Amino acid sequence: VPYRFATERRDYSDYASGRVFYGLPGFPAMPVRLAGEMFARALAFRAAQSLHSPCTVYDPCCGGAYHLATLGYLHWSDIDAIIGSDVDEEALSLAQRNLDLLTPAGIERRIAEIAQMSAAYGKPSHAEAQASAEVLRKQLLGLVEEHTIRCELFRADATDGQALQTKLRGRPVDIVLTDVPYGRRSGWQVPPTAPASSLTPAGRMLEALLSVISPSTVIAVVADKQQSLAHPAYRRLGRFQLGDRHVVWLAAQEYVIMNK
């Protein structure tokens, strides 16, 4: 059984993509349980280094950021900031709407949108969305009393280390959690002007991340089995396979970071 932390088969219907959280065709939605497992294991690897403070989570291939928004709701106390980037402007627009749902103003705006759709069309799905939105609003109002999660998005090619370094401006990244492009619904968009490399796009992303991470950063990546997630500058902390996908947790070799 691959799940060690998200072992409970709970009902995540209130968090379904397209109900309250925004979704669009062509933007895959990482399963809530899988995202939770990836994050929880990353936290465990941090705890093994005696690191327990709320962390900054970064996704260099954030897409619509559905998984980042649900992580915020379900792991609020463990997250200080969420940063996402993508090369696709449409993805970033969708991501902004989803991350706005981590704010009272954003959830109120979404409730108003759903109410308008319900009044206009009266579909059962709209009634379900209204009920779920009220659940999320109540949950969020309790969470923001604890602290707020800072969210930021920017446009960048995940394989361009210089661009990532410029945009992140030296801010520490504690956990990188990403679902890299694969399959028929999404794909890598490596610019034609990118330097030639023998690495795969996923390998180039890992190479680029070396410019913005520290030896304590935990990288959690999910990809299809055809994409290798090995890189000589990283050591593997853990791995599991789930259907046609595999998930790995990595950390940079300390000597690599020291020599950057």
Where are these regions (language model features)?
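Class I S-adenosyl-L-methionine-dependent methyltransferase catalytic core
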Residues: 1-260
